[in-house]
C-alpha cells in the first residue's frame, strides 16, 4: 500500500472481523475511516454509522453522515454480509432472499451510492 494520504474510507460491516481489521489498517495508514454497523457498534476511534445495508434509505443516510463528517467517500470497502447457518433443504425462500439481499444486492446498493459521490467530487 502507498503512503497515507488522509483519504476518506467507508467500510460497511466494519465493526468486527475482517471489516474491523480493514478499518484498523486504513486508520494506521492515516486515512479517515468511517464504518457502518447493524448490530455490534465498533470500538472507539472510528466514525460509526448504524446502517442496515438492505435498506436504500439507510445506505443513503449513512453516506450523507459520512460526507458531512469527512467529505466525499474516496474508497469503499463493501464488507457487510450475513449468513443463515442451515442446510439448503431447511432454508426457506425468505431466508435465501434475506441472505442474497444482504450479501449481493447490498453490495450493488452501496457501490452505486459511492459512485454518485465519487463522480460529484471528480
Annotated model-derived regions:
Residues 65-76, 84:
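A glycine-rich helix->loop->beta "capping" turn
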Residues 8-11, 76-77:
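Conserved hydrophobic beta-strands of the Rossmann-like cofactor-binding core
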